Amino acid sequence: MSQVILDLQLACEDNSGLPEESQFQTWLNAVIPQFQEESEVTIRVVDTAESHSLNLTYRGKDKPTNVLSFPFEVPPGMEMSLLGDLVICRQVVEKEAQEQGKPLEAHWAHMVVHGSLHLLGYDHIEDDEAEEMEAIETEIMLALGYEDPYIAEKE
């Protein structure tokens, strides 16, 4: 049986109203076991300042972002189940959900699904990569009982 170990770090000034650990676990379990038997993922929920700093340092973008993915590269000859870290910015997720008219829980789920696929090596830089990644995201989100996160773009 596939197992995803979650290390959840809540690093916001106010952690009230965030999804439960069980929800984060459910969202990870909907993605990762399809691609990898055992894995460990850290999800760190942060405020705008930390997201901004990390986005500037690692992507050269001078603003906070919804989710950052940091895949762990296992050294040759070692076997480890550590997949990597997701850093999700609470304020950006909440703002995007409101602006896009999406249920907040669904947008949180989408950020975990999207970030997890990045940890697994998927990307959306090229159009064909984006189509493949978005199709997988949509399939997983529908299986979780949420709407297609890209429905507005398809209409």
Swiss-Prot record:
One of its GO terms (biological process) is rRNA processing. Binds 1 zinc ion. Pfam families: YbeY (PF02130). It comes from the Bacteria. It is found in: Cytoplasm. Its main location: cytoplasm. GO terms for cellular component: cytoplasm. PROSITE patterns: UPF0054. Keywords: Cytoplasm, Endonuclease, Hydrolase, Metal-binding, Nuclease, Ribosome biogenesis, rRNA processing, Zinc. Belongs to the endoribonuclease YbeY family. Single strand-specific metallo-endoribonuclease involved in late-stage 70S ribosome quality control and in maturation of the 3' terminus of the 16S rRNA. This is Endoribonuclease YbeY. It comes from Escherichia coli O127:H6 (strain E2348/69 / EPEC). The gene is ybeY.
